[in-house]
Amino acid sequence: MKLSEIAEFLSLEYKGEDIEISALNSLLKANFAELTYCDGEKNTKDIPHTGAAAILVSKEYENLVPKDTKVLITQSPHLSFAFLSKLFAKPLINTAKEKVQNIAKSARIMPNVYIGDNVNIGENVIIMAGAYIGDNVSIGDESIIHPNVVIYNDTKIGKKCHLLANCVIGSDGFGYAHNKNGEHYKIYHNGNVILEDFVEVGACTTIDRAVFDSTIIKAGTKVDNLVQIGHNCNIGQNCIIVAQTGISGSSELGRNVIMGGQSATSGHLKIGDFSTIAARGGVSKNLEGGRVYGGFPIMLQKDWLKLQAKIAMKFKKD
C-alpha cells in the first residue's frame, strides 16, 4: 500500500516521496518497508533509533524522527494506528479451495476436528474431538490437543505439549484506541503465539497473540486452568502459573517464576528469575529475582504478613 494512500485513508496531509508500505511494526523492529507509530512520551526515546520507512507521530515529536523516515503528523498516533491496523490485518478465514497439510502418519485425529491450510502435525500427535486448528499452525511431535481446544492461525506448538480442554491459543489481544468521545476502536493483531517444548496449558486458559511479534511461553512452563496471558508476554522457562492468574500484556517473567492462585500483574513489567508471587499478589512494578512477594501493593511476603498481623492487633485492641 502506498504511503499516499495511507495518508488519504487517515485524512492526513502528506506531500513527500511516495513509497510502498508492506506492513506495520513496532518502533525498534520496523524496517525500511514498514510503518510504525509513537503513542506517548515514554516511547519518544526510541524514535531516533527507528529503522521504519514511515512513522505516525504527533507534531511535538517530529524533530526526533530520523531524516530517512517519512513522517505522517497526527493528533492521535495510537488512534490512527488502530484505524490502519484493520487495513493490514491478516484474513481470519482462508478462502483457498484446496488445503496443503503435512500430517504425520502416526498422528491420531479424532472426529469433528477442523484443520486449516498449511498445517504441520508431527509424529504421534493426538488431537481430540472438536478441536480447531487454524492456518499456518505447527504442532510438534507427541503433543496432545484435548477436546474443543482452539488454536488460531500462525500458532507454533513445540514437542510434547499438553493443551487441555477448551483452552484458546492465539486469539486477538485486548487492545483498543479511544477517541475524544470515549469510543473504542479495535487494534488488529498480526503476531502469533509460540509454545516451546514441554509446555502444558490448563483447561479454559487463554493466551493472546502479539500485536506484531510473538507471545512466547518458554520450554517446560506449566499453566493451570482459567489463566489469562495477555498479548506480547514473554514467559520464561519452567514457570508455574496457578489457576485464575492474570498476566497483563507485555509482561516478562524470568525462568522458574511461580505465580500463586489469583495473582496478577499490570503490563510492561519484569519479574526476575526464581521469584514467587503469593496467592492474590498484585504486581505493579519490576521485581528482583530470587525472592518471595505478596500482597498489594506488592512487597516481600514476610513484610506483608507482618503488616497483616499489625492490622489485626490494632483492631483487636480497639
UniProtKB/Swiss-Prot annotation:
UniProt-listed Enzyme Commission number(s): 2.3.1.191
CDD domains: LbH_LpxD
GO biological process per UniProt: lipid A biosynthetic process
InterPro entries, per database record: Hexapep, Hexapep_transf_CS, LpxD, Trimer_LpxA-like_sf, UDP_GlcNAc_AcTrfase_non-rep
Pathway: Bacterial outer membrane biogenesis; LPS lipid A biosynthesis
GO cellular component: membrane
Reactions the enzyme catalyzes: a UDP-3-O-[(3R)-3-hydroxyacyl]-alpha-D-glucosamine + a (3R)-hydroxyacyl-[ACP] = a UDP-2-N,3-O-bis[(3R)-3-hydroxyacyl]-alpha-D-glucosamine + holo-[ACP] + H(+)
Database matches in Gene3D superfamilies: Hexapeptide repeat proteins (2.160.10.10), MurE/MurF, N-terminal domain (3.40.1390.10)
Pfam families reported in the protein's UniProt record: Hexapep, Hexapep_2, LpxD
Active site residues of this protein: 231 (proton acceptor)
Keywords noted in UniProt: Acyltransferase, Lipid A biosynthesis, Lipid biosynthesis, Lipid metabolism, Repeat, Transferase
GO molecular function: N-acyltransferase activity
PANTHER family xref list: UDP-3-O-ACYLGLUCOSAMINE N-ACYLTRANSFERASE (PTHR43378), UDP-3-O-ACYLGLUCOSAMINE N-ACYLTRANSFERASE 1, MITOCHONDRIAL-RELATED (PTHR43378:SF2)
Role: Catalyzes the N-acylation of UDP-3-O-acylglucosamine using 3-hydroxyacyl-ACP as the acyl donor. Is involved in the biosynthesis of lipid A, a phosphorylated glycolipid that anchors the lipopolysaccharide to the outer membrane of the cell.
NCBIfam families for this protein: lipid_A_lpxD, PRK00892.1
Homology family: Belongs to the transferase hexapeptide repeat family. LpxD subfamily.
Entry protein name: UDP-3-O-acylglucosamine N-acyltransferase
